[in-house]
Each structure stands twice: as structure tokens, then as C-alpha cells.
């Protein structure tokens, strides 16, 4: 958490969207791999 906070503070606007995109991709990949099936279903 501390690391994410520092990164966000360092570049607010380039890291935030990137993190959100990664989160979205990870969430989409998770159900495909068998991680989070609730949101996908």
C-alpha cells in the first residue's frame, strides 16, 4: 500500500489510469484462469 501511495503521489495521472487498466485486465484474466468467478458471472 505504501508503495502504491508513493507511486500515485509521484505521478498522479499516469500511474493511476495504468493501475486501473491493469486491475481491469487482471480481473478479466482472473475469471478466465479460475480466480474471481463472481464478478464475471
Swiss-Prot record:
SUPFAM superfamilies cross-referenced by the UniProt entry: Histone-fold
This protein's GO CC annotations: nucleosome; nucleus
GO molecular function: DNA binding; protein heterodimerization activity; structural constituent of chromatin
Gene3D superfamilies xrefs: Histone, subunit A
Highest taxon, organism lineage: Eukaryota
Location of the protein in the cell: Nucleus; Chromosome
Keyword Transmembrane: no
Keywords: Chromosome, DNA-binding, Nucleosome core, Nucleus
The keyword Magnesium is assigned to this record: no
InterPro entries: Histone-fold, Histone_H3/CENP-A
Ranges for region Disordered: 1-41
Function text: Core component of nucleosome. Nucleosomes wrap and compact DNA into chromatin, limiting DNA accessibility to the cellular machineries which require DNA as a template. Histones thereby play a central role in transcription regulation, DNA repair, DNA replication and chromosomal stability. DNA accessibility is regulated via a complex set of post-translational modifications of histones, also called histone code, and nucleosome remodeling.
Assembly mode: The nucleosome is a histone octamer containing two molecules each of H2A, H2B, H3 and H4 assembled in one H3-H4 heterotetramer and two H2A-H2B heterodimers. The octamer wraps approximately 147 bp of DNA.
Family note: Belongs to the histone H3 family.
Protein name: Histone H3.2
Organism: Tetrahymena borealis
Organism classification: Eukaryota, Sar, Alveolata, Ciliophora, Intramacronucleata
Amino acid at each position: 500500500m505504501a508503495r502504491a501511495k508513493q507511486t500515485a503521489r509521484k505521478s498522479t495521472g499516469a500511474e493511476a489510469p495504468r493501475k486501473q487498466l491493469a486491475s481491469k485486465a487482471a480481473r478479466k484474466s482472473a475469471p478466465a484462469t479460475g480466480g474471481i468467478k463472481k464478478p464475471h458471472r
